[in-house]
């Protein structure tokens, strides 16, 4: 029996480092409608025609320091313009597309490695399928830059992730080619299945394709979706983009983090299971010719081959009802097109999963050799790979959190840390280096992370669960049912709270105060600076009779003195502090907004009024004594927070209303994020759009006091 074989070949720039490990050729099968068999081809390089002419890595890198010529890509504005290209031209298009991605991301920053890894796959998908009628969904969206370039947005790539520019993810309102908005992981199989079922109910015939990475496959939603897809049996295609990056490699310290979970092991076995393929082909051949008990025996041989040779990999997908094809070289356009065409032409087969193996950072040597594969980058010099990061006088809040947690763990061996595939993003890679047996990466699985932490708390440990504010939303039921209801002392470190700049609304931490402070047993706090963060880490460690959480922003500290060795001192729970004493007006800030209040106080003072500024520290429990004092001794009270409605200000208003503090002449105004999503942009632009700049706060003070002239002066000349 002739078998079509696929193998990964190194390509890209001359001088790229050899890939670790080995990808063994394996048969990609389609028993439902067999691929046309062809003789096994010699292993070949798919190096770009451009790179092949460059004799050194330096020449190849310098080639990208200026915008490289892209004569073929210049003729392709939309996928329709690709349809008549030859295979050789498609490869050239991929080479030029990769160069264009490198050039643009070097100017804007963004998610480079993921996009470089799917260039050939993107070309093949848009060549075979008729988008936008056919739907292609890109999970997470990190890898969508080549897709954007090929779908009418190349001229807007210089605006990527900037105010009023292109989103760094797929976005339905941006293009009809973006079938589904993304930013968080593991959603596309669910959405694609919904689209496929909706198509069937309407009698449509279009194709639906979900592209999902091996990292996203660690989330439970992906398996829930596959389970339902197998049951509903609607025609759809799932492409598993396997680049061995199950844990997001954000700013790793000691080289690439090993992929997390059993899935990684299963996929690795699938990549080297040629005996499995041959046994399965034999078994299928037998089952077509015989029946009865012998037929059942042959089927068992097939199942035995899967279990003994490949582990649970293909068994898992096929037991869920998805027809498995692969593994396939994700950088071989010829093979990709052949398989995609065959799957597209074969209808009424139900869901199909194509296992595609790619290399993150493909074709750019600095990305290929980097520990994080240049997952997310700032602007950089393509010729050297050096990123243009402004030197900072202080560390990031993320790093201060990590240092403070290490300080606690040094003194208490019950302190453990959990993150969801974000060791670099949460700073816990530093904790891992110091305490390798007390740091747990659970993969992209926030729901599991929360309940896993709850189990640790049941055993008397002190778990700190570090998760981005917007990502913790996925584990909210677990926070309620598994932690707060049982009053288990899990500590939630909510990173990226508030506005996050270029990553936009999908990553904005707007809602955490609202959804955490409504829980009866939760202690909710937020630091106003990096020293306060150290103290709140210590406070959380000391709270051992109930759950607690603290939020902190993206960005760097403000430069205040720090406690020795980052070891904080536990705060009195539910007690705030007054930072400035003034009259008539009190600004009660929460978290990072305290700094905006201090700056606003300076603006107001230039107009002859000195205001009081207080740091609430806690949203739950509130410092009722402090609020009574501020409300009774001032004409105006402003609560200021970088969070949504229903948060800190709402809790203050609830207390004041019940306490009768709003029955007199006090004027209370809440300053919060607007009740809408704020698009990506610079932090300064986002803060201005939200109306939370010091100028906005100062102007609000004078507007409430009836001094419109002063308010107008501040907004007209903000620093006046």
UniProtKB/Swiss-Prot annotation:
HAMAP family: DXP_synth. It comes from Oryza sativa subsp. japonica. Induction: By the mycorrhizal fungus G.intraradices colonization in roots. Residues 56-65 have a biased composition (Basic and acidic residues). GO terms for cellular component: chloroplast; chloroplast stroma. This is 1-deoxy-D-xylulose-5-phosphate synthase 1, chloroplastic. Its main location: plastid. Pathway: Metabolic intermediate biosynthesis; 1-deoxy-D-xylulose 5-phosphate biosynthesis; 1-deoxy-D-xylulose 5-phosphate from D-glyceraldehyde 3-phosphate and pyruvate: step 1/1. Its EC number is 2.2.1.7. It is found in: Plastid, Chloroplast stroma. Residues 35-46 have a biased composition (Basic residues). Belongs to the transketolase family. DXPS subfamily. The gene is CLA1.
């Amino acid at each position: 029996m002739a078998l079509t074989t696929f193998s990964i070949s190194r390509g890209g720039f001359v001088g790229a480092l050899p890939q670790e490990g080995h990808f063994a050729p394996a048969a990609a099968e389609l028993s439902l409608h067999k691929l046309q068999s062809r003789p096994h081809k010699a292993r070949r390089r798919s190096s770009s025609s451009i790179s092949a002419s460059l004799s050194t890595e330096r020449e190849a890198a310098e080639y990208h320091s200026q915008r490289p010529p892209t004569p073929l890509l210049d003729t392709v504005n939309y996928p329709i313009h690709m349809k008549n290209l030859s295979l050789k031209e498609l490869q050239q298009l991929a080479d030029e597309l990769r160069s264009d991605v490198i050039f643009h991301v070097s100017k804007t920053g963004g998610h480079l490695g993921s996009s470089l890894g799917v260039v050939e796959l993107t070309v093949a998908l848009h060549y075979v399928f008729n988008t936008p009628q056919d739907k292609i969904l890109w999970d997470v969206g990190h890898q969508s830059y080549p897709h954007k370039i090929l779908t009418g947005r190349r001229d807007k790539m210089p605006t990527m992730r900037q105010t009023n520019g292109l989103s760094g993810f797929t976005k339905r309102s941006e293009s009809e080619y973006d079938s589904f908005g993304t930013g968080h992981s593991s959603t596309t199989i669910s959405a694609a299945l919904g689209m496929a079922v909706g198509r069937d109910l309407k009698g449509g015939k279009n194709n639906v394709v979900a592209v999902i990475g091996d990292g996203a496959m660690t989330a439970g939603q992906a398996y829930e979706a596959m389970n339902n897809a197998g049951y509903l049996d609607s025609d759809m295609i799932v492409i598993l983009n396997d680049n061995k990056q199950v844990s997001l490699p954000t700013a790793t310290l000691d080289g690439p983090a090993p992929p997390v979970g059993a899935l990684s092991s299963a996929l690795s076995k699938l990549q080297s299971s040629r005996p499995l393929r041959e046994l399965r082909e034999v078994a299928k051949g037998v089952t077509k010719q015989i029946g009865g008990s012998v037929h059942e025996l042959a089927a068992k041989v097939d199942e035995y081959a899967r279990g003994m040779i490949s582990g649970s990999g293909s068994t898992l997908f096929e037991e869920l009802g998805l027809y498995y094809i692969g593994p396939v070289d994700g950088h071989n356009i010829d093979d990709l097109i052949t398989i995609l065409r065959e799957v597209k032409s074969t209808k009424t087969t139900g869901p199909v999963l194509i296992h595609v193996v790619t290399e993150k950072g493909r074709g750019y040597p600095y990305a290929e050799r980097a520990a994080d594969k240049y997952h997310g980058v700032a602007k950089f010099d393509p010729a050297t790979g050096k990123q243009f990061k402004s030197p900072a006088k202080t560390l990031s809040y993320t790093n201060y959190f990590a240092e403070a947690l290490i300080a606690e763990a040094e003194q208490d061996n019950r302190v453990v840390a959990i993150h969801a595939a974000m060791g670099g993003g949460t700073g816990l890679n530093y904790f891992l280096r110091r305490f390798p047996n007390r740091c747990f990466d659970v993969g992209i699985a926030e729901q599991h992370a929360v309940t896993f932490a709850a189990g640790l708390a049941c055993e008397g440990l002190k778990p700190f669960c570090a998760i981005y504010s917007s990502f913790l939303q996925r584990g909210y039921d677990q926070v309620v049912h598994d932690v707060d209801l049982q009053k288990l002392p899990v500590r939630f470190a909510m990173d990226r709270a508030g506005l996050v700049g270029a990553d936009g609304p999908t990553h904005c931490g707007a809602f955490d105060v609202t959804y955490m402070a409504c829980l009866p047993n939760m202690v909710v706090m937020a630091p106003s600076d990096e020293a306060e963060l150290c103290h709140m880490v210590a406070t959380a460690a000391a709270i051992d009779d109930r759950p607690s959480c603290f939020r902190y922003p993206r960005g760097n500290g403000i430069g205040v003195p720090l406690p020795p060795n980052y070891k904080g001192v536990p705060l009195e729970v539910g007690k705030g502090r007054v930072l400035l004493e003034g009259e008539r007006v009190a600004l009660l800030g929460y978290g990072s907004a305290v700094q905006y209040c201090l700056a606003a106080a300076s603006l107001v003072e230039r107009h002859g009024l000195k205001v009081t500024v207080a740091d609430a520290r806690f949203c739950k429990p509130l410092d009722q004594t402090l609020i009574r004092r501020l409300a009774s001794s001032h004409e105006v009270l402003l609560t200021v927070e970088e969070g949504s409605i229903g948060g800190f200000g709402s809790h203050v208003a609830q207390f004041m209303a019940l306490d009768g503090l709003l029955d007199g002449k006090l004027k209370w105004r809440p300053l919060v994020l607007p009740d809408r999503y704020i698009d990506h942009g610079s932090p300064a632009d986002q803060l201005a759009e939200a109306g939370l700049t010091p100028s906005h706060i100062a102007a609000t003070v004078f507007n409430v006091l009836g001094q419109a002239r002063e308010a107008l002066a501040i907004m007209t000349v903000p620093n006046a």
